């Protein structure tokens, strides 16, 4: 709609007239942007085996075509993604260890929420939304080789990604308002704790057995953090055999410990509050 955003309605098409008298018409727009990326890294060696390391990345983006789908124009402000990490490393003949603290954020994420009129569940209106997310974290990554042929990879990550400025609302044709405020809530589908355990053993130089154990802590299934999925393990295992220079064989077993769990979101529950969760 030219200048006046309205929700979809029966018979919606170019030239149609909404209940408030707004005529549906194409809205023309034209933008020309340059996205940039910067990276810097530094390492300081205290000894031959121990030192400090840090890196920083700064990316910029702009909205893509899908962000212009709602009736309202999206926020076209620059999207910035700063990532900074700093920590220590230690290497010798049997261990390679890195432990880093990190910070990452993303500003001006564009999204669309379908808000429902509390007096008429068939009256649904799309609301454009621009919000930020950020997290601090800690990651420790190690590869241990205690004896010949055996490798053990360990990865631990703690993070706490949260929404910032996650607020929007709409006014329906009957004057009723509906809105959402999820500022400070944990980002959906992202676990706070990640663990990877990856042992492997070379029986011979051509025959290797391996396994992988991955843990994902509790993840929230809706924006209001009313629903969540419990933490879960994923397991994999396999064998790799280099028969000769022309032939390699491998076999993989998935979920060999018969672990159960779920991930993702719950359709239709995006706006359910903790107080109203069943």
Question: Where would I find each of the regions flagged by the language model?
Answer:
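Short, intrinsically disordered, charge-balanced linker/junction segments flanking boundaries
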Residues: 1-3, 40, 48, 66-71, ...
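Extracellular loop and loop/strand-boundary signature of outer-membrane beta-barrel proteins
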Residues: 19-29, 69-76, 83, 123-129, ...
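Short acidic, glycine/proline-rich loop/turn micro-motifs
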Residues: 65-70, 111-113, 165-168, 221-225, ...
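Gram-negative outer-membrane beta-barrel transporters
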Residues: 2-10, 14, 30-32, 41-61, ...
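C-terminal beta-signal and adjacent terminal beta-strands/loops
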Residues: 112, 217-220, 240-278
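Outer-membrane beta-barrel domain signature, strongest for Gram-negative TonB-dependent receptors
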Residues: 83-100
